[in-house]
Amino acid sequence: NSKDIDPLIKAAKKNKVIIKEAFMVRHHPQWQWIKKFIKSGNIGKITNISSVFSYNNKDPKNIRNIQKYGGGAIYDIGCYPTVISRYLLDKEPKKLVASNFKDKNFKTDVLSSVLMDFGGIYSSFTVATQSNKSQQVFILGTKKSIVIENPFNAEPKKSTNIVIYNGNSIYRKDNTIKTFPPIDQYEVQVTAFSDHLLKKTKVD
């Protein structure tokens, strides 16, 4: 929780160093493009963001399944749909409701669903650790909608696609595909932070 971060912040201030949370997704060009696209007004007003992120891991020795080490779906991957919603909307949620199902042996959540209220804009997500491997984000606007095929774990050696549905048909016949070339979002993240330290550039 936020209290766990306080000692790190104090240490950084004391030693006059810079720290940054390592959310690599914010540095992938697809998300930066989407944020600009939303700000342009092309999608209209965002009404909902829906995300799914899941994998299947039942190894009792894996840190993701050990409660005392912060295991479970919410702690492991729930942060990604949360941070993307905050990044795109430039807002903090006013309230949220959540429900989860826990493994009877691990005592960690293996299936969790969350609904966040950003004040007239909803963001909902489901994360799971004992389900089919899957990831997707759907952004619903009053004019158009967007589907991000590989929103969180983008393969560094393969291109990524986002699909923009123009809203002229409920059957999604009228769409545009935006393709981004292969890129390692972790490398981009490290480069951005290094440039911030060495060249005083702005880091988002």
Residue ranges and their predicted role:
Residues 25-104:
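Predominantly a Rossmann-like dinucleotide-binding segment in NAD(P)-dependent oxidoreductases
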Residues 9, 13, 35-38, 86, ...:
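A structural alpha-helix within SAM-dependent methyltransferase catalytic domains
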Residues 137, 155-171:
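Short polybasic amphipathic segments
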